[in-house]
């Protein structure tokens, strides 16, 4: 069974993007093994710390290397990628052997996709950033992204409610991700 690693770009307890990831996990049930990356202890990227890599970074790299695919669930912060996700991608896109900068990284040739819950109607702005960044760091992107706007009521209830259309879109994205692995 394929292994899909979820990266939730919001560290907030009960985040809407974590709720979206839970729905995606249901879409992958019986088709893939899902795990969630815990990266809250990763330090800010700093070349002075790069070699040897901090233990938290080494652990991240191992988890990413063990996965067949990466699925990022990203909020939109100021129309861009959240800093914690960018930091994670900076660490894990670096060559594993620093004497060979174009050599393999934890993310090189890794299949990946992105979904996002954003305030307002659409996370298109953050998708532009991912569509530029992920190929640059040599990932194989499944460009069938799912975007969900937060309903104003969700801020009061804390609950993300997806329409049948959005659930179908998420399921189709899951199938496309699995097809890209195999």
Model-derived features with residue positions:
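A structural preference for short, hydrophobic beta-strand core positions in alpha/beta folds
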Residues: 35-38, 143
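Glycine-rich phosphate/pyrophosphate-binding loop and the adjoining helix
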Residues: 5, 140-182
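N-terminal beta1-alpha1 ligand-phosphate binding loop
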Residues: 2-31
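Helix-loop-strand module that forms the ligand-binding subsite of alpha/beta enzymes
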Residues: 53-137
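N-terminal beta-loop-helix "entrance" segment that forms/cooperates
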Residues: 39-55, 154-159
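A generic structural motif
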Residues: 29-35, 139
């Amino acid at each position: 069974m394929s292994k899909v690693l979820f990266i939730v770009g919001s560290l907030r307890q009960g985040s809407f993007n974590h709720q979206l990831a839970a729905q995606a996990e249901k879409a992958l049930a019986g088709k893939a093994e899902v795990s969630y990356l815990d990266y809250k202890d990763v330090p800010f990227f700093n070349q002075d710390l790069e070699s040897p890599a901090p233990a938290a970074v080494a652990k991240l790299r191992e988890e990413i290397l063990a996965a067949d695919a990466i699925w990022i669930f990203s909020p939109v912060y100021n129309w861009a990628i959240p800093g914690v996700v960018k930091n994670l991608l900076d660490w894990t896109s670096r060559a594993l052997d620093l004497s060979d900068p174009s050599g393999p990284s934890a993310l090189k040739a890794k299949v990946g996709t992105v979904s996002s819950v954003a305030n307002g109607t659409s996370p298109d702005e953050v998708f532009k950033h991912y569509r530029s960044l992920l190929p640059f760091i040599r990932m194989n992107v499944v460009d069938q992204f799912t975007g969900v706007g937060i309903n104003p009521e969700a801020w009061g209830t804390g609950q993300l409610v997806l329409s049948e259309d959005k659930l179908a879109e998420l399921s189709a994205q899951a199938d496309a991700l699995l097809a890209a692995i195999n």
